[in-house]
Amino acid sequence: MAQQTPLYEQHTLCGARMVDFHGWMMPLHYGSQIDEHHAVRTDAGMFDVSHMTIVDLRGSRTREFLRYLLANDVAKLKTPGKALYSGMLNASGGVIDDLIVYYFTEDFFRLVVNSATREKDLSWISQHAEKYAVEITVRDDLSLIAVQGPNAQAKAATLFTDEQRHATEGMKPFFGVQAGDLFIATTGYTGEAGYEIAMPNEKAAEFWHALVEAGVKPAGLGARDTLRLEAGMNLYSQEMDETVSPLAANMGWTIAWEPADREFIGREALEMQREKGTDQLVGLVMTEKGVLRNELPVRFTDELGNQREGMITSGTFSPTLGYSIALARVPAGIGETAIVQIRNREMPVNVTKPIFVRAGKPVA
């Protein structure tokens, strides 16, 4: 039987259509996925992301452990509360998961990992933490609400105490702070400003209801997916998995190659892949009628006249732009146009950077 988050009852009260999402009963939408999408782009919307896993790591060698575990380098994290995004790789350079890591003190870091990969993540982390005597605490006592949109921070702040307002004032992106019983982070999965707020499970329903009263619109998994795709953000199991290199998933920027003497899991394989070359993740835009869908083939002719083929990893109709967009993994050498096979039709598409909307505006 699928698990329920502490906000399940709130979702049903708000009229949600609930679906099983990787073993969790989650809201797909509350009546109109399109309205929820536009609310986040133009005002403020919120998502229950309590199905994600928060993991606290403690011990004097925690930083050393994370420098080995992750492809990005937590040595960059020097200010308490600062966060970074990273892949957690296997020895062959495949992506076990993508995650966010927060630095609090030298012996206290926090990870936020995906729900679908929870068990394998925890097993992998535990397996490698033992050598470093790192203590692992899974924070199942916390709920997580993402409040996103141009007015999200202002509306959320109406619920904060004076201490919480002071703590978050002027906070830059990718920071988190514990203030009272809330952990408030300037992170998200929509391409908009906002907060991801963790709180004790018993406080979640009251906080959700207060956000509704403050004019924040509940939004479901459907809008979350179209928003993240417009923002060019990867979804685990579609843009990457354990067989896909971060170099082929537009995650090259998350690999800290320097210092050259830092060992991390997957480094040797990545160096070979970088030398040999990999597929690349690109954006596709189709302004003609139709919708680009996952797993459709993408064909093009390279500079040598060879026919090459890739595949759409995520595709949808963009509510913000009014036409279809997609992310696709293709061989190197693609030009500015390609062909996507939709049923028996060959549809022309423009090839772009893998990002379409940022802060509510089209990315040229």
Curated annotation (Swiss-Prot):
Gene name of the encoded protein: gcvT
InterPro entries noted in UniProt: GCS_T, GCS_T_bac, GCST_C, GCV_T_N, GcvT/YgfZ/DmdA, GcvT/YgfZ_C, TrmE/GcvT_dom1
Listed name of the protein: Aminomethyltransferase
Keywords: Aminotransferase, Transferase
A GO BP annotation: glycine decarboxylation via glycine cleavage system
Superkingdom of source: Bacteria
DNA damage in keyword set: no
Transmembrane spans: none
Record carries keyword Magnesium: no
Function: The glycine cleavage system catalyzes the degradation of glycine.
Enzyme class: transferase
Gene Ontology CC: cytosol; glycine cleavage complex
Molecular function per GO: aminomethyltransferase activity; transaminase activity
Residues of the signal peptide: none
Organism: Enterobacter sp. (strain 638)
NCBIfam families for this protein: gcvT, PRK00389.1
Family, as annotated: Belongs to the GcvT family.
Subunit structure: The glycine cleavage system is composed of four proteins: P, T, L and H.
SUPFAM superfamilies recorded: Aminomethyltransferase beta-barrel domain, Folate-binding domain
Catalytic activity of the protein: N(6)-[(R)-S(8)-aminomethyldihydrolipoyl]-L-lysyl-[protein] + (6S)-5,6,7,8-tetrahydrofolate = N(6)-[(R)-dihydrolipoyl]-L-lysyl-[protein] + (6R)-5,10-methylene-5,6,7,8-tetrahydrofolate + NH4(+)
Enzyme Commission number(s) of this protein: 2.1.2.10
